[in-house]
Regions:
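C-terminal membrane-cytosol helix-exit motif in multi-pass small-molecule transporters
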Residues: 71-90, 107-118, 136-154, 368-376
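12-transmembrane solute porter fold
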Residues: 41, 61, 127-132, 142, ...
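Helix-loop-helix hairpins in multi-pass membrane proteins, especially solute transporters
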Residues: 1-100, 268, 329
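Juxtamembrane C-cap of transmembrane helices in multi-pass membrane transport proteins
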Residues: 114-123, 296
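Flexible interhelical linker loops that connect adjacent transmembrane helices
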Residues: 30, 78-106, 124-125, 150-179, ...
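Intracellular terminal tails of multi-pass secondary transporters
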Residues: 356, 373-404
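Interfacial loop-to-helix junctions that mark the boundaries of transmembrane helices
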Residues: 1-3, 7, 60-69, 96-98, ...
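Long, low-complexity inter-transmembrane loops of multi-pass membrane transporters
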Residues: 140-167, 389-404
Length: 404
């Protein structure tokens, strides 16, 4: 099962950056918000119906039936890709991946995630927790230093116009020197950190603490997923018209308010209050994620930087999402244990822990609002047509200076 999940994650990890690069290569700047919004809407269809179908399948046929369904979907997707997709643009058949860096990334990020996952069961003081985390951190540091050196050698060779170029870095971290891209990447990572943890915590509240079935849990979460599907589409269109700053600020505020409302859940809360708050949260997520991602990649120069930026931002978001769930679950269990020591029942202690985990998630969302307010500005944060006019003006000035 673990090997299967690794293969699933590897396939997904490859497809999403390639999809982003394709959109940025095909669509002009004036249409990228719309294109990314459409892509986001399509990518949200499965999360919209997945929990409901998964809950129904689990109740009816057991959890193994979910993987059978995924196998059928994977085969259909493979056939569609084989017969419906074709390459575009130039490509280099001689390009080779840096497999040593790939190994370092697997050891580094895998060890870190494995340690965080074990911390839920064994605590941070257990060797099975801190051991993999130490190995993972060493692997990540080695990976970063190796790719920084490889990037420096590659750029020096390109600048000297050498015929034989050295191997490019697996992950070009130089894009993080772009302030706007870094702000966008951190903002999206915070959103994933705060958001993914709720997808773990709230089913525990619905099923374990309130006693509802897995199917009912999926139905409660369904409206939010549909809301994100729609809001990502309109968020992309709104970015083209109004710019990234107002749309992302609106989305981050809505996400914060929804998380704050969800932190008010109690033992006797109307169960559909969870659905309403999750709907509000995912509306905010849709209006935040696509505009901030599109804006941060728009601030990079050329296809090579966009390709590197897409890989970096997706890596950062996946790490944040993977770390966010175990960290907040650990905090939830810690608060629950403290409350239980005071004489509370198991259910009351669990809900107390969930409330505090959601309050911490609200604080993270508030930090994200401040980052958008103070960080999303300058070139690329305004309306798309203003960005195009500004870039055209800069190009004309550069041509005049070159002519003189």
């Amino acid at each position: 099962m673990l090997v299967g999940r690794v293969l699933e994650a590897a396939g997904t990890g490859v497809m999403w950056p390639v999809l982003q690069i394709t959109v940025f290569s095909i669509y002009p700047l004036s249409r990228r918000g719309f294109a990314m919004g459409t892509v986001g809407m399509a990518m949200s269809v499965a999360p919209a119906i997945g929990p409901t179908l998964g809950g129904w399948q689990t109740d009816a046929n057991g959890w193994r039936s979910i993987f059978l369904t995924m196998t059928v979907i994977g085969v259909v997707s493979l056939l569609a890709a084989m017969f419906g997709l074709h390459n575009f643009g130039s490509h280099d058949p001689s390009a080779r991946a840096d497999f040593f860096s790939v190994s370092l990334s697997v050891i580094g990020f895998g060890g870190l995630m494995f340690g965080f996952t074990n911390s839920e069961t064994y605590g941070f003081t257990a060797p099975v927790t801190w051991g993999p985390m130490v190995v993972g951190l060493i692997g990540i540091v080695w990976f970063v230093l190796r790719n920084l050196r490889a990037g420096k050698r590659y750029r020096e060779a390109v600048a000297k116009d050498k015929s034989a170029l050295p191997q490019p870095p697996l992950l070009d971290l130089e894009v993080l020197k772009n302030r706007s891209f870094t702000v966008g990447t951190i903002t999206a990572s915070l959103a994933f950190f705060a958001f993914s943890s709720i997808l773990v915590i709230m089913p525990l509240y619905i099923q374990t603490d309130r006693g509802y079935s897995a199917t009912m849990s999926g139905l409660i979460m369904l409206p939010g997923a549909i809301g994100q599907c729609v809001s990502q589409f309109f968020g992309g269109r709104a970015m083209d018209r109004f710019g990234a700053r107002p749309v992302a600020l609106f989305g981050s505020i809505v996400l914060t308010l929804g998380t704050l409302g969800m932190s008010l859940v109690a033992m006797d809360t109307w169960i559909w209050w969870v659905s309403i708050c999750q709907f509000i949260r995912q509306i905010g997520m849709g209006f935040l994620l696509m505009p901030i991602t599109t804006w941060s990649l728009n601030c990079l120069n050329g296809p090579s930087e966009v390709s590197a930026g897409s890989s970096v931002t997706n890596t950062a978001r996946q790490i944040a999402g993977a770390v966010g769930a175990p960290v907040l679950v650990i905090l939830m269990e810690t608060f629950a244990a403290l409350h239980k020591q005071g004489g509370a029942s198991a259910v009351a202690a669990s809900i107390f822990g969930i409330q505090w985990a959601l309050r911490i998630s609200t604080m993270i969302c508030l930090a994200m609002v401040l980052m958008v307010f103070f960080g999303v500005k300058g070139d690329g944060a305004g309306r798309t047509r203003d960005i195009i006019s500004l870039r055209a003006l800069r190009e004309r000035r550069a041509r005049r200076m070159a002519a003189n």
